[in-house]
């Protein structure tokens, strides 16, 4: 089991760890209208998956805005996944004035978190992470942020996304 910190305290990550070069496992999450969504729904497109503990926090808000602003300039898709309820994600999108942001909720089964090794066991939230997948769902970049309240390496993730 991998360990990170969150606000300085130790947190254990559970789930299957994936690495660069692996093919990304499938997952089932919910969109803002409670429809089931899987990785297969985005087949044939490169993907930047931004994982946040809660969309309602300052760091998560900034991470979501930054990746959507920068990566949306490229061909492909940006997904933001958290364990927030779909209603909270929908409210955040509306209050942020962002209609092109795709937020997905892993609250029900933690399917994404378990399959990508980012479930913070003690908090039942997802750890801050970034995964970049090519159009065939091969993982070309992975970062699990070692301190959950820190930002990911935006430059490295965006460079990996742009270079696919």
Swiss-Prot record:
What disulfide bonds does the UniProt entry report for this chain?
60-93
Q: What is its EC number?
A: 1.11.1.24
> What domain of life does the native source organism fall in?
Bacteria
**Which residues are responsible for catalysis?**
60
Task: Please name the GO terms that the record assigns under molecular function.
Answer: thioredoxin peroxidase activity
Listed A to Z, the keywords are: Antioxidant, Disulfide bond, Oxidoreductase, Peroxidase, Redox-active center
Write down the SUPFAM superfamilies for this protein, in alphabetical order: Thioredoxin-like (SSF52833)
Outline what the protein does. Thiol-specific peroxidase that catalyzes the reduction of hydrogen peroxide and organic hydroperoxides to water and alcohols, respectively. Plays a role in cell protection against oxidative stress by detoxifying peroxides.
Family to which the UniProt record says this protein belongs: Belongs to the peroxiredoxin family. Tpx subfamily.
Oligomeric state and interaction partners are given as: Homodimer.
What other comment is given for this protein? The active site is a conserved redox-active cysteine residue, the peroxidatic cysteine (C(P)), which makes the nucleophilic attack on the peroxide substrate. The peroxide oxidizes the C(P)-SH to cysteine sulfenic acid (C(P)-SOH), which then reacts with another cysteine residue, the resolving cysteine (C(R)), to form a disulfide bridge. The disulfide is subsequently reduced by an appropriate electron donor to complete the catalytic cycle. In this atypical 2-Cys peroxiredoxin, C(R) is present in the same subunit to form an intramolecular disulfide.
Q: What is this protein called?
A: Thiol peroxidase
Show the taxonomic lineage: Bacteria, Bacillati, Bacillota, Bacilli, Bacillales
């Amino acid at each position: 089991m991998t360990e990170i910190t969150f606000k300085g305290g130790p947190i254990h990550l559970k789930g299957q760890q994936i690495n660069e070069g692996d093919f990304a496992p499938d997952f089932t999450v919910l969109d803002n209208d409670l429809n089931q969504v899987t990785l297969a729904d985005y087949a044939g497109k490169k993907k930047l998956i931004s994982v946040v503990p809660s969309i309602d926090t300052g760091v998560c808000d900034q991470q979501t805005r930054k990746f959507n602003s920068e990566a949306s300039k490229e061909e492909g898709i940006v997904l933001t996944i958290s364990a927030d309820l779909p209603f909270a994600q929908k409210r955040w999108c509306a209050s942020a004035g962002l209609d092109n942001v795709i937020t997905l909720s892993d609250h029900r089964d933690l399917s994404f978190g378990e399959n990508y090794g980012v479930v913070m066991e003690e908090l039942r939230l997802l750890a801050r992470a970034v995964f970049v997948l090519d159009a065939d769902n091969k993982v070309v970049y992975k970062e699990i942020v070692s301190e959950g309240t820190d930002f990911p390496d935006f430059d490295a993730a965006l460079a990996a996304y742009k270079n696919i």
